[in-house]
Regions:
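A short helix-loop-beta-strand connector motif used in the catalytic cores of GNAT acetyltransferases and
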Residues: 59-71
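Conserved GNAT-fold acetyl-CoA-binding loop/helix
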Residues: 39-59
Length: 183
């Protein structure tokens, strides 16, 4: 089996407090609650002006190519509260970059760390990846804590162009290799 077959087999994932599942168009209102608040996505993309814009983003960037993209749902309410996805997946090198966001009122509860740890485990055990990385803005302390708690190590700091503002920014590159995972 290749990576895509394995990802298809794990389109639904359950953790202690979360469901990870493919996005649905019905998630648009929950997605809008996240995307319309600039505090939720300060480091991801600009706040969205209205539900129609959110529906466009949801359909074109989260639903259109569903493999390796999960809606994070709270088990208690079954509401979509965030996303976790392989931003960049290199099938040849067997490596991927994880990207994620979570609604602000769910921050600080260990939920994103729980989701990342589950994907780390699946990435090395089932998807046969050799390395994972997480890239954060230097100012994004919350995402850095998630990366470290999930076992990633700081690999380097670098400058890069922000994909939305086109301004040069400082980033941290965290890495976790298959060998590090099994230590």
């Amino acid at each position: 089996m290749n990576i895509w077959t394995n990802l298809a087999a794990y389109s639904l994932i359950e953790t202690q407090r979360l469901y990870l599942r493919p996005f649905l168009f019905e998630d648009a209102e929950d997605f809008y609650k996240i995307a319309s608040n600039p505090e939720n996505l300060h480091f991801i993309f600009p706040a969205q002006a209205d539900l129609a814009e959110t529906q466009y983003v949801l359909a074109n960037y989260f639903i259109k190519n569903p493999l390796g993209v999960w809606a994070i749902c709270d088990k208690e309410t079954n509401r979509m509260i965030g996303s976790i996805k392989f931003e960049k997946l290199d099938e040849i090198k067997s490596e991927a970059e994880l990207g994620y966001f979570l609604r602000k009122d769910f921050w600080g509860k260990g939920l994103m760390t729980e989701a990342v740890k589950e994907l780390v485990n699946l990435s090395f055990e089932k998807f046969q990846l050799k390395e994972l990385k997480i890239v954060t803005h230097v100012e994004n302390i919350g995402s850095q804590k998630v990366a470290l708690k999930a076992g990633f190590r700081l690999f380097r700091q670098f400058k890069g162009s922000d994909r939305y503002t086109r301004k040069m920014r400082d980033y941290y590159d965290f890495r976790l290799g298959r060998g590090d995972f099994y230590e």
